[in-house]
């Protein structure tokens, strides 16, 4: 890897994350938590955004990320993990992904 690409990628990811924070609350996000490479400072040129979203929804879990991809139209690779407040409360102590995400993730927005 050539020097500087990781830093440039980090700036691109930060810029896109900032845009998400501006737009997502208007679309129903109650909490936005950055997880993955950017949240732990381990960015490579292949890194994307991983975002844990808390929102009220009746949609099945497997369909929830599509809403965010459709509405935000990310300019970088972005994965959305969407939970309802009740699911987050019920699973935060038992689900390995949530336990790790909540311990290392960076809260970017909360309505509470």
Q: Residues of each region from the PLM?
A:
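Catalytic core of pol beta-like nucleotidyltransferases
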Residues: 1-31, 39-45, 55-112
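Short beta-strand->loop micro-motif that forms the acidic, two-metal-ion catalytic signature
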Residues: 51-53
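Short, conserved active-site loops that position catalytic residues or coordinate cofactors/metal ions
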Residues: 47-49
């Amino acid at each position: 890897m050539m020097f500087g690409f990781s830093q440039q990628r980090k700036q691109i990811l930060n810029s896109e994350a900032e845009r998400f924070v501006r737009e997502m609350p208007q679309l129903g996000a109650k909490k936005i938590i950055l997880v993955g490479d950017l949240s732990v400072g381990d960015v490579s040129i292949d890194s994307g955004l991983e975002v844990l979203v808390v929102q009220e929804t009746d949609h099945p879990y497997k369909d929830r990320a599509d809403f965010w991809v459709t509405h935000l139209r990310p300019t970088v690779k972005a994965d959305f993990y969407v939970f309802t407040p009740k699911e987050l409360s019920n699973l935060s102590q038992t689900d390995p992904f949530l336990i790790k995400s909540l311990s290392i993730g960076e809260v970017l927005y909360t309505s509470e």
